[in-house]
């Protein structure tokens, strides 16, 4: 298959999700043990409920059955990304200003590759995270292209 499974599924899922005024957050196609899982994560400003997940699952399952883009057997799961949703797109960072985030970088910045703190600023190129070291607050500027992965962080 020349196209990645996730890209093909995204093309099928996006119109379904858009028609329900939801956001397509992420798609994973992973093997766990002997089974393959196609996971589709959806969200909205108000969160998503089981009915919305079921609507997306039913409509997407129908499209997947018609096109049959995946050769192996798999389980389709449609759900919310949860409290620690991934930040994949620039718009995700813009919507998460003021929230606690966990960011891992491809290479160290000031000798560190993992940052957890408040997302203070985002200008489209640089993410600024305010971290607390003991009792002192410090702002770290992280170039967007150096972010390996990022997600919201739940703190207790």
Curated annotation (Swiss-Prot):
GO CC, one annotated term = cytosol
**Which terms under GO biological process does the entry name?**
ribosomal small subunit assembly; translation
Q: Which superkingdom heads the taxonomic lineage of this protein's source?
A: Bacteria
- Pfam families, A to Z: DUF150_C, RimP_N
**Which cellular compartments is it found in?**
Cytoplasm
Q: What is its main location?
A: cytoplasm
Keywords (alphabetical) are: Cytoplasm, Ribosome biogenesis
Q: Which family does it belong to?
A: Belongs to the RimP family.
Cited function: Required for maturation of 30S ribosomal subunits.
What protein does this entry describe?
Answer: Ribosome maturation factor RimP
